[in-house]
């Protein structure tokens, strides 16, 4: 049973999650590259088309390298509390995000892409939307905040109350992410199009580049998410070996 539990953790929480996020990662890059080529198709400027195609690839590639820097910046002590551990992980993610913002402005400046400053701002919008979604998820799922505490208290009156409260809380928890995504789409469209609704090509390119920005920190976030199953596997191995409670 312990082995099956460990295998299930690896399949669902590492392989499954990794494949899902990898698909989103590659999909955003390829879609943005196609939108970049289409955005400049009427100008017959093949050089600018090429720059628009490789820009999301360069941002994603640099994001991987900067995520590695963020991972190595995570430092903890042996007797660290849960709050200290979460703070250290948050520091690594935030550091990667800041470095990616700086790298994005540098990359698009070197490419001299049309409207490169506002396109860079669209990447920042994507990163901010990702942060908002992450914070919202933490707020609605962490035991440190009121929603889960209130849900736990509802269990005192019976399982039916927990089910009803849980479904309601789950529905409510989608509001902030949905609003953040809608605002991000509108903002990135306006920024990349130069606040011109008729410039649909550049607006759609801005939405795509914002999605690339949102996923540019995937390296460190995926590593953080995979830590849970790995730690659980270690606990399972210790249990099978009959090791003491201190392990």
Predicted regions and their residues:
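Hydrophobic packing and interface segments
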Residues: 1-247
């Amino acid at each position: 049973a312990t082995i099956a539990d460990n295998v299930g953790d690896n399949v669902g929480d590492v392989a499954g999650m990794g494949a899902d996020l990898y698909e989103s990662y590659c999909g955003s890059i390829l879609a943005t590259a196609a939108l970049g080529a289409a955005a400049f198709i009427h100008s017959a400027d093949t050089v600018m088309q090429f720059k628009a195609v490789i820009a999301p690839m360069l941002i994603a590639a640099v994001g991987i390298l900067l995520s590695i820097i963020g991972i190595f910046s995570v430092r903890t002590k042996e007797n660290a509390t849960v709050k200290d551990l979460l703070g250290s992980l948050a520091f690594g993610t935030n550091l990667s995000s800041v470095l990616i913002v700086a790298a994005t402005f540098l990359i698009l400046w070197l490419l001299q892409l049309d409207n490169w400053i506002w396109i860079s701002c669209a990447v920042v919008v994507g990163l901010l939307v990702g942060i908002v979604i992450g914070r919202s998820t933490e707020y609605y799922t962490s035991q440190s905040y009121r929603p889960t505490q209130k849900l736990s208290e509802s269990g005192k009156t019976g399982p039916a109350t927990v089910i009803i409260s849980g479904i309601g809380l789950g529905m409510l928890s989608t509001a902030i992410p949905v609003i953040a995504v809608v605002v991000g789409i509108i903002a990135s469209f306006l920024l990349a199009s130069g606040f011109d609704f008729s410039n649909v090509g550049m607006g759609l390119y801005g939405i795509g580049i914002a999605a690339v920005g949102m996923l540019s920190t995937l390296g460190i976030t995926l590593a953080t998410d995979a830590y849970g199953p790995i730690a659980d596997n270690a606990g399972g191995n210790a249990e099978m070996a009959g090791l003491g409670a201190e392990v």
